[in-house]
Amino acid sequence: RTSAYQMSIMQHALPYFANQTVMDVGAGNGILSLFALQAGAKLVFAVEASTMVEHLHHLVRAAHAQDGDSVPNMWTRDRLAVVHARVEDVTPGMLREAAPIPVEPRVDTIVSECLGVLLVHERMCETLLEARDRFLKPDGAVFPRVGILCFSLLNDTRMWQEVRARGEWWNTTDFYGIDLTP
């Protein structure tokens, strides 16, 4: 999945990423933010609610720690703005404050790995739509812009028994001498 995102971002670099302001919604470890920067984004807002955001803060600090050619990820310097918050809680002021350069709090492109189980498991689609409605410029783009669900009927008794057995695990009275029953 990661390579598919990288390929899509690089293939669409000129119209949607090069010299553009980008928001990575639910940035997680920041890989899509970094891909957007590799594709030439002027600035990326990496918005993440979890503590995974600390890794991105570390990358930003490391890029600013010293000068010279040997600085790791020097190409991210003054181009990556980390926002530790849920998109629903982000304000334009928070974006302005996080940005290393003066910028309006509207973005040209939104990117997100919003793919939970069947697209909806992690409820990121709603968050992505919230970001689109609040922060995307009228002529902006969203990646991915389409999600397709495909279904097929399947009857696999063995798989069903395995899944059911996992649920029954909590009813074990002697798991290495431990009673797991409530």
What spans do the regions from the language model cover?
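Class I SAM-binding transferase module
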Residues: 1-2, 6-25, 32-182
